[in-house]
Amino acid sequence: NKPDLEEYADLLEHFPEAVITLHGWLRVIPAEICNKFSIFNGHPGLITMYPELKGKDPQIRAFKAKHEVMGCVIHRVTAGVDEGKVLEEDYFNAWNITEEDMWKVLKMRSCFLWLEFFKKRLGFKK
């Protein structure tokens, strides 16, 4: 189920100053909406180091490829898949990591990254 431009606009017109965060949205948002609102995406693939990890399930692809460094990013949302400017990144040594530990570390690092993002970019304090 993919919302169209009108559905996005109908919902978001009630929140013109909103900061929108995406977590596993997996849909392309129309350019008109991306340009009008502050939308950010958390992506569990280190696309600054491995651009081929854009798109779905990057953490699984990185694990299967045995990347020695893994991580996550927060980027501005554009109409292209994971094409927006990367604003924050965090990474870790994934050498010899188990898949179970990879999921745990990525979750922890992603949560930390969002907290740092809100503090730095949006001026939130303790």
Predicted regions and their residues:
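One-carbon transfer enzymes
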Residues: 1-126
